[in-house]
């Protein structure tokens, strides 16, 4: 266990960041699953815009890697084009 006050504070801050990042990642994953289940192209396109924004924001904040965000956006775009 940490002995110094600053180390204890870092542990608390890291735990808070971890929870926030996990929430963001889970929200993003849920939105992606919803997009994959949509059969209507117009609805998929509108949902795609929000998912892309979520992925870009997550990549910008280093929650996910930027290449993973790019690959996911590419796969989702291919999925929408197949509808």
UniProtKB/Swiss-Prot annotation:
Biological process (GO), any one: translation
Pfam families linked to this entry: Ribosomal_S20p
Record field: transmembrane: none
Entry's Gene Ontology molecular function annotations: small ribosomal subunit rRNA binding; structural constituent of ribosome
Keywords: Ribonucleoprotein, Ribosomal protein, RNA-binding, rRNA-binding
InterPro entries, per database record: Ribosomal_bS20, Ribosomal_bS20_sf
GO cellular component: cytosol; small ribosomal subunit
Cross-referenced Gene3D superfamilies: Ribosomal protein S20
Stated family: Belongs to the bacterial ribosomal protein bS20 family.
Role played: Binds directly to 16S ribosomal RNA.
Name this polypeptide is given: Small ribosomal subunit protein bS20
Gene name tied to this protein: rpsT
